Structures are given as structure tokens and as C-alpha cells.
Amino acid sequence: MSVSVCPCGSGNLLDACCGHYHAGTPAPDAQALMRSRYSAYVLGLVDYLVATTLPAQQADLDRAAMAAWSAQSTWLGLEVESAEVLGGQPEHGFVTFTARWHDQDGDHQHRERSAFVQHAGRWYFIDPTVGLKAGRNDPCPCASGQKFKKCCASYVGS
């Protein structure tokens, strides 16, 4: 049992917060998944970061770059500005946040409005840096069974 405070900024212990998501419990919503992904970067849990990215994008992730960024950064904090659940089937959500870190080039902060989709009881991050190989009338890569244009297309800027 970990007695360390969770890096996500909740103030809770890691095991009572993001730690159980890292151990396999599905995050209950997009904000919890986003917080657990930040904690995974802090803790160097690249397998978790890959597993919580939309499955159709996982093969194209640069695991080595993710691991290097995680290891070479001192993580300074996470601020969640807003979380929106849009409903529908499948359920989509957005989380707006700012992450701060320090590396050999100095202090940095990154503000992002991340998109998420829920499928089969699990939330997934839709990575804007990894293209989705789907035409508008193709089945959606999130495996919802809907056409891409009726599902995730508007959430990935395609």
C-alpha cells in the first residue's frame, strides 16, 4: 500500500486515487482518466498511457518518446479547468487542463482541451497527435459501430 500523495493534485493517497486505475480499475469518467494519465506520466507508467489511448491509435504511439519525456521531466502540477460530458452513444467528453513541468530547458506549461470517448465501459483518450485512419463513412475507430462522421470525427478535428 502506497502512502504517497497522488500526483494528480487531488490531495488523496495514490492508492485511493489514480493508483487503482493504474492497477486496472476503469476510470469512471473522462476527468478521472485524464488525471490518472497525468499521474502515469509522473510515475513513468507508459504501458498505462498506451492502454488508455484509443485502441485504434495505440500502435502509432511513440512509446520511447513518451518514456523519455516522462523520465526527463520534473512534474510540477496539474490544474483541471473544466470537464464536460457530452452524452450520446458512445459517450464523449472533454477535459480542459494545464500541466506544468520542468526539464533541462526550463519550466513549461501546456494547456489542452482533450477529447475522450467511452467504449465497453472504459474511457479512452483520443490523441490529437496520432491520426485516425478512417474516412467519414467508415466505421468509427472507437468501435462504436457508428460511422466515423456520426461519432468521433467532430472530436478529433477531422
From Swiss-Prot:
Coiled coil: none annotated. SUPFAM superfamilies: NTF2-like, Sec-C motif. Belongs to the UPF0225 family. Gene3D superfamilies: 3.10.450.50. InterPro entries: NTF2-like_dom_sf, SEC_C_motif, UPF0225, YchJ-like_M. This is UPF0225 protein PputGB1_4297.
